Amino acid sequence: MKKYRVNVQGMTCSGCEQHVAVALENMGAKAIEVDFRRGEAVFELPDDVKVEDAKNAIADANYHPGEAEEFQSEQKTNLLKKYRLNVEGMTCTGCEEHIAVALENAGAKGIEVDFRRGEALFELPYDVDIDIAKTAITDAQYQPGEAEEIQVQSEKRTDVSLNDEGNYDYDYIIIGSGGAAFSSAIEAVALNAKVAMIERGTVGGTCVNVGCVPSKTLLRAGEINHLAKNNPFVGLHTSASNVDLAPLVKQKNDLVTEMRNEKYVNLIDDYGFELIKGESKFVNENTVEVNGNQITAKRFLIATGASSTAPNIPGLDEVDYLTSTSLLELKKVPNRLTVIGSGYIGMELGQLFHNLGSEVTLIQRSERLLKEYDPEISEAITKALTEQGINLVTGATYERVEQDGDIKKVHVEINGKKRIIEAEQLLIATGRKPIQTSLNLHAAGVEVGSRGEIVIDDYLKTTNSRIYSAGDVTPGPQFVYVAAYEGGLAARNAIGGLNQKVNLEVVPGVTFTSPSIATVGLTEQQAKEKGYEVKTSVLPLDAVPRALVNRETTGVFKLVADAKTLKVLGAHVVAENAGDVIYAATLAVKFGLTVGDLRETMAPYLTMAEGLKLAVLTFDKDVSKLSCCAG
């Protein structure tokens, strides 16, 4: 074998690395390492294969190969090892420059220093010890910490070659057709895999069919109806009559159909993978049975999602209750709606029907809404919902549920007192359970956890290394954007031969109530539990000019920072369009920005996002004493 380095232009991301790697593998290359940042591919070829063939393969993949360099065996000493080194004592970009110069003088290459994250990335020749770099940093008056050697192979292609595994019907079978499934299929097709997707029901999964899309369009309708009846401006004589729910639901269903076709169904032919309709179950680790036919694949992805689950309350099974799916198909607004469960689904759908005209009561076992959130967030949304007229029942013990004609009765005990809550409709919104019981997972050696979730490792592999899983059927945050991220990563690992870890350290979440709730990073309590010395800022919404002009001032901004480094650890918001605000905070948390970084960054006036800037100023100032935009 001969080893080569080829310069490659046109790569912009890790996906490009995979495309180049697949192209090289298909023409016979081995030990492939592609790096889009350095713009190069390193690989081995049999002695009888010309490097020009490899360059042609790269060109056929729509990238631009440059000069090729053959490695001689003695050249290993010229190769580089890559390190990540924690560094304390940096406070600004000037510190970054000092460390970069020190490392360069020690022989390091490819140096990247980030004072916000407190780390340095660099490469050293194989024969240079890491202690030389650490000594150079110490001599520059900074404090080096632990050094981690970044094994290029750990995130590059493994020795997996699907071409060597025998004959199968498909390279990749995906069970499910939601966000994780489609993301994975698209990525796998880009890696030249033959892909099939199996779906027993409606294509598109929860989000587009019965979750995000239908609920959010109806929530918007409810907000407009509520504002028409309760607008805060004098001189505007608005009103709203009773809601005709049937045509509103039809409009919602038309939108769902349109988005399902555009974002899911039509993509099947666009990308060229196969859809198989039917129930699937594993026969063994390489085979599933669908509609009586056995189908084989080299790799599988289980992305079957989750469904509503009901609590164990006596009498509930005998009551005609609603789920989040069936509620959105009602053709008439009920006079009264009781909601068991006050998580994000219960709050959103409860407020929706309150805004459409129902008398709504939310019931939950815990003493406060969103008990896993910071108290300030719970207090703000509790105040908002109660101000709007929604009934909140907390600290409830459920005794039984019964139906008396058309009336559903929920018997609870609160602080030792019995109470019966009656309504024409009862919504159960107490959580979701993974969908996997019909898959016959034991036949494939796939284990599940105590909740029925599929057990996966950091690379999205199940307990069978040929079978991966992603999305709501696994542990972790149940958001469609998380599912899509995991689905793409699963394909890169399963088909692309990579070994990339899933990273869910910084995941924003939004509850689409009005005001909405958005959060990212650590709460104050979580930060303390992780050992941080914490500094917090709490800004009431009536200190944000946008809220004042909107005449909607119930809400809060809260920031959590590391008291030592002032890095932003978490951001939590209750405000109009909080979900649109939280992305900026997500970037701050992910990239280790500090309170100072945000303080020195301008925010446009009269936007809700300005609340982040004002919350930053609140760490050190009383913003009520500042003029507009002063900081």
Curated annotation (Swiss-Prot):
Any GO BP: detoxification of mercury ion
UniProt cofactor note: Binds 1 FAD per subunit.
Stored SUPFAM superfamilies: FAD/NAD(P)-binding domain, FAD/NAD-linked reductases, dimerisation (C-terminal) domain, HMA, heavy metal-associated domain
Residue span(s) of domain HMA: 2-66, 81-145
Domain of life: Bacteria
MF terms in GO: flavin adenine dinucleotide binding; mercury (II) reductase (NADP+) activity; mercury ion binding; NAD(P)H dehydrogenase (quinone) activity; NADP binding; oxidoreductase activity, acting on a sulfur group of donors, NAD(P) as acceptor
Effect seen on changing Y605H: 2-fold decrease in activity
Pfam families documented for this protein: HMA, Pyr_redox_2, Pyr_redox_dim
Residues binding Hg(2+): C628, C629
Family the UniProt entry places it in: Belongs to the class-I pyridine nucleotide-disulfide oxidoreductase family.
Quaternary organization: Homodimer.
The protein, known as: Mercuric reductase
The species this protein was found in: Bacillus cereus
Name of the gene encoding the protein in the UniProt record: merA
